[in-house]
Amino acid sequence: MSDARAQTLITIAELASLLQGGAPVVLLDVIDEKGAAPEDRPKIPGALSVHLATDFSDKPTKLSGRRPLPKIMDLQANARRWGISRDSQVVVYDSSAGAQASRAWWTFRWAGFRNVRILDGGLAAWTAAGKPTSTDILSEATKAGTVALQAGHMPTIEAQQAARIARSGVLLDARGKAAFVGEAGKPATGHIPGAKLAASGDNIAGGQFRPAAELEAQFAALLGNDGSEVAVYCGSGNAAAHAIAAMHSTGRTPALYVGSWSAWSADPSRPVAQGAEPG
């Protein structure tokens, strides 16, 4: 496994080995508001249930988009409650091929905590490998951590920068094709003019991230090699974080438009393109 991929993803076998060896691993089961309640889903033994909407995001405003970044001190308090210290190894996972876990991974790295990886394949791959699960509902560690976090360690952009990058660089839309194309007669649907469709689902095969060589070829074809500025958005920043994780595994670190389409479309003065072409 390449260094970049190993810094982004952890395999089922690697995690099982760490847990068996007693390594200081903090396991976080990442849930969104549409997912199953903690009591309705099995977990990897010892995993803490965490929520994107409340633990990794601030309260949204009219123009912020659905998933604004958390206040750094709130995130730090949560991380300490989960038992995270500077030397902890954090593994985030979900039951949706990394769609939620990737946003948690990105947020930790944005906050300066780099020793965090996404469990490749998540809970589905864990159970498919015959590994044990638990129904215990845990929300905090038995011993608080001491980690210190600081915002700004991953690149982010706002709407004005997104518009500029769409013209002069590469702006990727990580939503599915239907959302990108939009609906005729509905002006708040479609995409940012100039953006390219790069659905985050294209980075997955069989519930896991595609092999490194496939992702490298995919992104090389999509981005070129002229050094253009690259940024990613989606509906609310989750699928975009998943796409960024995939690119990060190949050594790339594009910027995230955190507000994404939910922020862009909240301002009716902003232009919208519809159809399959960038526009």
Name the predicted role of every residue range.
Residues 1-279:
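Cytosolic catalytic domains that perform sulfur/thiol-centered chemistry
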